[in-house]
Amino acid sequence: MISQASIKSLSDILDLESSNFVRYIQEVAKLRPSRSGDAEAIALFEELYQDSSSNITELSALLADHAAVFPQVSWDMDSARYNFLRPVFLLAPLTDSFRDDIGRLDQLAERIVEAGWEEAQQAVDRLRGQKSAALERIESLAQKLGGLESDPPERSGSSASRW
């Protein structure tokens, strides 16, 4: 029998993946590609988004047998500051987000391991491995494009305050 704690933990992992920063980038942020490197960053974001969608499908299928769970998507209001930026400027926050997600995954996976839920444990291990590989790709692209780009523009005040 699978414990309620492990079901809750897997549900929390589903919520974490559903609220992934790359999903925010693809679904909400209106990116402004304009220079070299932007196309590479956008291609990476699209690939990571597809991976995330596959992960959500897999986790939802595992949970469907045990509970009626729907992903709870929640993005930090602070993420709005990333709207309308060039894609290359989102690589650093995406790196930080993936690092945080991996750490959170490790915490949430403990209850699944303790319960001995083999299928869920394998899914979480795949997700962790996928996120680690993605983190390396993001860092590699950020390093490659880092020399080409300057710091992102600083926003101070609203557009009305600059009139």
Model-derived regions, located:
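Iron-associated oxidoreductase/ferritin-like identity signal
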Residues: 1-163
